[in-house]
């Protein structure tokens, strides 16, 4: 989710910490 932010925008928030 960290390296695929663009690929997975749904987990982007979760990976970022909220």
From Swiss-Prot:
Localization annotation: Secreted
A molecular-function term among this protein's GO annotations: toxin activity
Protein name: Scolopendra 5924.74 Da toxin
Zinc in keyword set: no
Tissue: Expressed by the venom gland.
Claim: GTP-binding is one of the keywords in the record: no
Main subcellular localisation: secreted
Family: Belongs to the scolopendra toxin 5 family.
Alphabetic keyword roster: Neurotoxin, Secreted, Toxin
CC per GO annotation: extracellular region
